[in-house]
A protein has these predicted regions:
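Short strand-connecting beta-turns/loops that link adjacent beta-strands
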Residues: 57-59, 90, 156
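N-terminal short leaders/motifs
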Residues: 1-14, 36-43, 94-107
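Alpha-helical membrane-targeting segments
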Residues: 1-34, 118-141
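Charged, low-complexity, helix/coiled-coil-prone segments
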Residues: 12-24, 47-57, 153
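Short, structured beta-strand-loop surface elements
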Residues: 68-148, 154
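A broad, low-specificity signal marking well-ordered, structured residues that form hydrophobic/aromatic
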Residues: 35, 52, 61, 83, ...
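Short beta-strand segments
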Residues: 32-66
Length: 157
Protein backbone atom coordinates (compact mmCIF):
# COMPACT_ATOMS: atom_id res chain seq x y z
CA UNK A 1 0.00 0.00 0.00
CA UNK A 2 2.99 2.36 0.27
CA UNK A 3 4.49 4.45 -2.50
CA UNK A 4 4.87 1.69 -5.06
CA UNK A 5 5.95 3.46 -8.24
CA UNK A 6 6.47 7.10 -7.38
CA UNK A 7 8.96 9.18 -9.39
CA UNK A 8 11.29 10.43 -6.64
CA UNK A 9 13.57 12.16 -9.19
CA UNK A 10 10.65 14.30 -10.29
CA UNK A 11 10.03 15.14 -6.63
CA UNK A 12 13.65 16.32 -6.30
CA UNK A 13 13.13 18.62 -9.29
CA UNK A 14 10.01 20.08 -7.67
CA UNK A 15 11.94 20.58 -4.42
CA UNK A 16 14.59 22.52 -6.35
CA UNK A 17 11.88 24.88 -7.59
CA UNK A 18 10.71 25.44 -4.00
CA UNK A 19 14.29 26.21 -2.91
CA UNK A 20 14.57 28.80 -5.69
CA UNK A 21 11.23 30.39 -4.79
CA UNK A 22 12.40 30.82 -1.19
CA UNK A 23 15.76 32.19 -2.39
CA UNK A 24 14.16 34.89 -4.55
CA UNK A 25 11.96 36.06 -1.68
CA UNK A 26 8.74 34.18 -2.38
CA UNK A 27 8.92 32.18 0.87
CA UNK A 28 5.84 33.95 2.27
CA UNK A 29 3.80 32.63 -0.67
CA UNK A 30 5.03 29.02 -0.87
CA UNK A 31 5.52 28.96 2.91
CA UNK A 32 1.82 28.37 3.47
CA UNK A 33 2.45 24.67 2.93
CA UNK A 34 6.23 24.36 2.33
CA UNK A 35 9.06 24.98 4.79
CA UNK A 36 12.81 24.70 4.34
CA UNK A 37 14.43 22.19 6.68
CA UNK A 38 18.20 22.31 7.17
CA UNK A 39 19.79 19.17 8.56
CA UNK A 40 23.42 18.20 9.11
CA UNK A 41 24.61 15.31 6.97
CA UNK A 42 25.13 12.22 9.10
CA UNK A 43 28.28 11.25 7.15
CA UNK A 44 29.48 14.44 5.46
CA UNK A 45 28.67 17.00 8.13
CA UNK A 46 27.39 19.25 5.31
CA UNK A 47 24.24 21.29 5.71
CA UNK A 48 21.37 19.99 3.57
CA UNK A 49 18.29 22.08 2.77
CA UNK A 50 15.11 20.17 1.97
CA UNK A 51 11.76 21.78 1.10
CA UNK A 52 8.93 19.84 2.76
CA UNK A 53 5.21 20.14 3.27
CA UNK A 54 4.26 20.75 6.89
CA UNK A 55 1.43 21.20 9.32
CA UNK A 56 1.68 23.47 12.34
CA UNK A 57 -0.06 21.90 15.32
CA UNK A 58 0.07 23.52 18.77
CA UNK A 59 3.25 25.47 17.94
CA UNK A 60 5.16 22.45 16.63
CA UNK A 61 5.88 21.63 12.99
CA UNK A 62 4.89 18.18 11.73
CA UNK A 63 6.50 16.70 8.62
CA UNK A 64 5.46 13.46 6.97
CA UNK A 65 8.13 11.26 5.40
CA UNK A 66 6.59 9.14 2.65
CA UNK A 67 9.88 7.24 2.33
CA UNK A 68 9.82 6.55 6.05
CA UNK A 69 13.15 5.92 7.72
CA UNK A 70 14.81 5.64 4.30
CA UNK A 71 14.51 9.39 3.59
CA UNK A 72 17.95 10.98 3.83
CA UNK A 73 16.65 13.98 5.77
CA UNK A 74 15.07 11.64 8.34
CA UNK A 75 18.30 9.66 8.68
CA UNK A 76 20.20 12.92 9.18
CA UNK A 77 17.78 13.87 11.97
CA UNK A 78 18.25 10.48 13.63
CA UNK A 79 21.99 11.20 13.75
CA UNK A 80 21.60 14.84 14.85
CA UNK A 81 18.16 16.15 15.87
CA UNK A 82 19.22 19.83 15.88
CA UNK A 83 17.72 21.51 12.82
CA UNK A 84 17.21 24.94 11.30
CA UNK A 85 13.84 25.78 9.80
CA UNK A 86 12.52 28.55 7.60
CA UNK A 87 8.76 29.00 7.41
CA UNK A 88 7.74 31.94 5.23
CA UNK A 89 10.06 34.74 6.45
CA UNK A 90 10.69 33.21 9.90
CA UNK A 91 13.84 31.30 10.79
CA UNK A 92 14.24 29.21 13.92
CA UNK A 93 16.30 26.43 15.41
CA UNK A 94 14.57 23.38 16.73
CA UNK A 95 14.87 19.85 17.98
CA UNK A 96 13.36 17.21 15.72
CA UNK A 97 11.85 13.96 16.93
CA UNK A 98 11.31 11.01 14.59
CA UNK A 99 8.04 9.15 15.24
CA UNK A 100 7.26 5.71 13.81
CA UNK A 101 4.11 4.93 15.81
CA UNK A 102 1.41 4.09 13.21
CA UNK A 103 -1.35 5.58 15.38
CA UNK A 104 0.39 8.95 15.65
CA UNK A 105 1.20 8.96 11.94
CA UNK A 106 -2.42 8.10 11.09
CA UNK A 107 -3.55 11.00 13.33
CA UNK A 108 -1.25 13.32 11.35
CA UNK A 109 -2.58 12.01 8.04
CA UNK A 110 -6.15 12.65 9.23
CA UNK A 111 -5.21 16.26 10.06
CA UNK A 112 -3.70 16.68 6.59
CA UNK A 113 -6.78 15.21 4.93
CA UNK A 114 -9.04 17.52 6.92
CA UNK A 115 -6.99 20.66 6.19
CA UNK A 116 -6.17 19.90 2.53
CA UNK A 117 -8.77 17.39 1.31
CA UNK A 118 -8.19 17.88 -2.42
CA UNK A 119 -4.37 17.90 -2.41
CA UNK A 120 -3.89 15.09 0.11
CA UNK A 121 -6.77 13.08 -1.34
CA UNK A 122 -5.08 13.24 -4.73
CA UNK A 123 -1.77 12.16 -3.17
CA UNK A 124 -3.51 9.24 -1.45
CA UNK A 125 -4.95 8.16 -4.77
CA UNK A 126 -1.93 8.67 -7.04
CA UNK A 127 1.00 7.92 -4.74
CA UNK A 128 -0.43 5.38 -2.31
CA UNK A 129 -3.14 3.83 -4.53
CA UNK A 130 -5.88 4.42 -1.94
CA UNK A 131 -9.19 6.20 -2.25
CA UNK A 132 -9.20 9.97 -1.86
CA UNK A 133 -10.87 9.46 1.52
CA UNK A 134 -9.16 6.43 3.05
CA UNK A 135 -10.50 4.75 6.17
CA UNK A 136 -8.71 4.95 9.51
CA UNK A 137 -7.62 1.32 9.07
CA UNK A 138 -6.11 2.14 5.67
CA UNK A 139 -4.27 5.13 7.13
CA UNK A 140 -2.86 2.99 9.95
CA UNK A 141 -1.70 0.39 7.43
CA UNK A 142 -0.06 3.09 5.29
CA UNK A 143 1.52 4.60 8.42
CA UNK A 144 3.51 1.40 8.97
CA UNK A 145 5.69 2.35 5.98
CA UNK A 146 6.07 6.04 6.78
CA UNK A 147 7.62 8.24 9.44
CA UNK A 148 6.61 11.49 11.08
CA UNK A 149 8.99 14.20 12.25
CA UNK A 150 7.93 16.71 14.89
CA UNK A 151 10.01 19.87 15.23
CA UNK A 152 9.71 21.94 18.36
CA UNK A 153 11.18 25.44 17.99
CA UNK A 154 13.96 26.44 20.39
CA UNK A 155 14.64 30.03 19.36
CA UNK A 156 13.11 32.28 16.71
CA UNK A 157 15.30 34.58 14.60
Amino acid sequence: MGAISFDWQRMKNIQQIHRILYTIGLGPIVGKIILLLTTTGRKSGKLWVTPLQYEEIDGAYYLGAARGLQADWVRNIQANPKVDVQVKAWHFQGIAEVVTNPGQIADFLEVRLKRHPRMIGLMMERVHHLSKRPTRAQLEELAKTEALVIIRPEAMR
